[in-house]
């Protein structure tokens, strides 16, 4: 392929990709307690997702996603990392 190389592109630098961060165990416990749910009840994200890979998320981790919104300022959501 023309121009191919072994460079890896970090998907987090694209302006449409919201901020993703892996929660610590304490943060995850606090969020789950606030929401009154088990981790498996959160929406899922696969460990093979490009952003999950770029932040080194492992199955069982919980990711906080912070999106900027013109209407609401910031919208925070959470994802449970599954294998795959």
Curated annotation (Swiss-Prot):
First-tier enzyme category under EC: transferase
InterPro entries: Arch_Rpo5/euc_Rpb5, RNA_pol_subH/Rpb5_C, RNA_pol_subH/Rpb5_CS, RPB5-like_sf
Keywords: Cytoplasm, DNA-directed RNA polymerase, Nucleotidyltransferase, Transcription, Transferase
Keyword Cell cycle: no
Predominant location category: cytoplasm
GO MF, one example: DNA binding
Enzyme nomenclature, EC number: 2.7.7.6
UniProt xrefs under Pfam families: RNA_pol_Rpb5_C
Subcellular location(s) per record: Cytoplasm
GO biological process: one example: transcription by RNA polymerase II
Catalytic activity reported: RNA(n) + a ribonucleoside 5'-triphosphate = RNA(n+1) + diphosphate
Highest taxon listed in the record's lineage: Archaea
Record's function text: DNA-dependent RNA polymerase (RNAP) catalyzes the transcription of DNA into RNA using the four ribonucleoside triphosphates as substrates.
Family: Belongs to the archaeal Rpo5/eukaryotic RPB5 RNA polymerase subunit family.
Protein name: DNA-directed RNA polymerase subunit Rpo5
Origin organism lineage: Archaea, Thermoproteota, Thermoprotei, Sulfolobales, Sulfolobaceae
């Amino acid at each position: 392929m023309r121009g191919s190389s072994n460079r890896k592109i970090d998907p987090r630098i694209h302006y449409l990709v919201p901020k993703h961060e892996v929660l610590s165990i304490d943060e995850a416990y606090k969020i789950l307690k606030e929401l009154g749910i088990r981790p498996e009840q959160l929406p899922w994200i696969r460990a093979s997702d490009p952003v999950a890979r770029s932040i080194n998320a492992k199955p069982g981790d919980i990711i906080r996603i912070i999106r900027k919104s013109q209407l609401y300022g910031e919208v925070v959501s959470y994802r449970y990392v599954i294998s795959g």
